Curated annotation (Swiss-Prot):
Species of provenance: Ruegeria sp. (strain TM1040)
Protein name: Small ribosomal subunit protein uS17
Keyword Transmembrane helix annotated: no
Upper taxonomic lineage: Bacteria, Pseudomonadati, Pseudomonadota, Alphaproteobacteria, Rhodobacterales
Assigned keywords, A-Z: Ribonucleoprotein, Ribosomal protein, RNA-binding, rRNA-binding
GO cellular component terms, A-Z: cytosolic small ribosomal subunit
Amino acid sequence: MPKRILQGVVTSDANAQTVTVSVERRFTHPVLKKTIRKSKKYRAHDEKNAFKVGDTVRIIECAPKSKTKRWEVLEA
């Protein structure tokens, strides 16, 4: 099974080698036919502490790095 790749915005870089990335998805409500925006936060491994709040990054699934980290920052 291929690894998922998501794109989002860094919302926190407070922890060492970890960034929090907010990923937004849009879909049309089946009944209301209205476009709805939902977001989810992922904690991703940032080896070099290179990314700051507001950066747009791509993250990829990986083996668990810690209790909450299952993603790595792929590129900006």
